[in-house]
A protein has these predicted regions:
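Periplasmic/ER-lumenal interhelical loops and adjacent helix-loop junctions
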Residues: 277-323
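Multi-pass membrane glycosyltransferase architecture that uses lipid-linked
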Residues: 2-284, 322-522
Length: 522
């Protein structure tokens, strides 16, 4: 087999044609490109401009984030502070300015250590998010009226969250090396721009995206550390370790999983242990609040409660939601082990977080941020992504119109309860639709947009192209579960020859795999 040239010795103009161009692979992307001059031509000279995919996508992400800030302008200019329902009718609500005073930052109270007046008692956020909030309060001017300080606090947080948004877009762009332009889906996602400054979720999403990038680069310890930090900012990221465990089981990569798990545990403890030891009541508030919180906005449980004469108690919902989540975890594990070809890491990460969102007793509109980067990596198909985003934007508008209805008194300006139930249903169906498409790709790998272009698992790191060692079901009996690649599976270098090896730029067809001899086979 001809030696593969290194990245250092290969000009960009030679490497670039191996990149996947969305305007050639995706009909919706091609149609959308007409707004900026049409699809890229076959003879386009690539790799010679300052405008690399990473730079373009980072700037687009900043631009879309700025549009999201403009959308919040009516609230910034007064709706957060005057009128019971105006912040909802303008669909520009944010927790950030309200919690500046409501959680004691205006009074310089120390999160977790100083008790708050009222029923909440302590800050109800994980430690790293509390640190983020506290740092923003240090950067906020302490002079002027409370309204002026809250405006400053929101702006400071918006600047910090914009950095997180760029990190997310760049990490997604760099995770699938041959598909950098998939990052545009993150940068252009309307639900991302609309919900980015509602709360502090982008911190955890940025750390999770960076963790996935590190795993794709075969750095399990760095992955674990970043995932541990993400879990210290929000609870959901630790769920990704579940499907990763099953994938490493199927591929026999226990050592790498152990490193990742150890790094995550150490990072989480470094952040949490000091607060646990010296302010346990404040530290535990997030967990007790999550457990004691009743059925809330956005979940199918709320529809059930609103339409039942004898609604279930919070304890019952907690138990049932946990059981449903465990069933989903079992189903995802079984799917991983019986799939004809080992699922990609991003596919399972998306499914496990989507399962948590669908079964949880609350769905705040900013939770869509958890799924956006994972959805792009799991199924980078513009049509399906935009269908899901349309559903999420509909829910975003629905919840604010419902709150406008409930807070406008006898005027009842907004969306009544039945209409809000339909909005919840749209959100649930949109998320389920994307889940079904991902599951179909797992069961029918030739339908997977990533694998159609010759990749195996570009976000999988050590799993990319690895042989299977434990498989269940028909795949184990037929021996069709192995998808081994000799060397890096993403690029086919070398001149064509009589023995059938690949020529430069030649691509393996859908459903084929590369054997140890470099030949294509079924």
């Amino acid at each position: 087999m001809c030696p593969m040239p290194s990245a250092e010795s290969t000009p960009a103009s030679v490497r670039e044609p191996d990149s996947v161009r969305p305007t050639r692979e995706d009909a919706v992307a091609a149609a959308g490109s007409e707004l900026i001059g049409g699809p890229l031509g076959r003879r386009a000279l690539l790799g010679t401009s300052w405008w690399t995919p990473v730079r373009v996508i980072a700037l687009v992400a900043i631009g879309m984030f700025a549009l999201g800030l403009v959308q919040k302008a009516p609230c910034y200019n007064g709706a957060w502070f005057f009128g019971a329902s105006s912040q909802y009718t303008h669909a520009c609500y944010s927790d950030i300015p309200h919690l500046y005073q409501g959680r004691g930052f205006v009074d310089d109270l120390v999160p977790y250590f100083d008790k708050l007046p009222g029923d909440m008692e302590y800050l109800e956020y994980p430690v790293l998010t509390g640190v983020f909030m506290e740092v923003a309060s240090w950067l906020t001017t302490g002079s002027g009226s409370i309204q002026h300080q809250e405006q400053w606090y929101w702006m400071v947080n918006a600047g910090m969250l914009m950095v997180c948004a760029v990190v997310i877009a760049v990490c997604v762009t760099r995770t699938h090396a041959r598909r950098p332009w998939d990052g545009l889906l993150v940068a252009l996602a309307p639900a991302f721009a609309l919900t980015a400054t509602i709360n502090w979720d982008l911190l955890a999403v940025a750390l999770t995206s960076a963790a996935v990038l590190m795993w794709s680069r075969m750095r399990p310890v760095a992955f674990g550390v970043l995932l541990g930090l993400a879990t210290a900012a929000k609870l959901y990221p630790f769920l990704i370790l579940g499907p990763l465990l099953v994938l490493c089981w199927r591929a026999g990569r226990w050592r790498e999983f152990g490193k990742a798990l150890g790094g995550a545990a150490v990072a989480w403890l470094v952040v949490n242990l000091p607060v646990m030891l010296f302010a346990f009541d404040g530290w535990s508030k997030f967990y007790t609040f999550s457990q004691e919180r009743g059925v809330d906005f956005g979940s199918f449980w709320l529809i059930l409660v609103h339409n039942t004469d004898n609604p279930p108690s919070t304890e019952t919902v907690n138990t049932l939601a946990t059981l449903l989540m465990l069933l989903c975890c079992g189903a995802i594990a079984a799917l991983t082990l019986i799939a004809p070809r080992r699922p990609r890491f991003a596919q399972l990460a998306f499914l496990i977080i989507a399962a948590f969102i669908l079964t949880n007793k609350v769905y705040s509109p900013q939770y869509v941020l958890w799924l956006v980067p994972l959805a792009v990596l799991a199924r980078p198909k513009w049509r399906d992504f935009l269908i899901w985003q349309a559903c999420e934007v509909a829910y975003f508008l629905g919840i604010w119109m419902y709150l406008a209805y409930t807070t406008s008194g006898d005027a009842h300006k907004g969306l009544p309860t039945d209409g809000y139930h339909w909005a919840i249903g749209v959100h649930l169906l949109g998320t389920l639709f994307l889940c079904v498409m991902v599951v179909r790709d797992i069961l029918m790998p030739d339908r997977d947009p990533v694998r159609q272009t010759g990749d195996d698992d570009p976000s999988g790191g050590v799993l990319d192209g690895a042989r299977d060692v434990f498989v269940l079901g028909p795949a184990a009996r037929t021996g069709q579960h192995s998808a081994h690649f000799e060397g890096p599976p993403l690029v086919r270098w070398g001149a064509g020859s009589a023995d059938g090896r690949f020529a430069l730029g030649e691509r393996v067809g859908a459903g084929e795999r590369v054997g140890a001899d470099g030949r294509a086979g079924r």
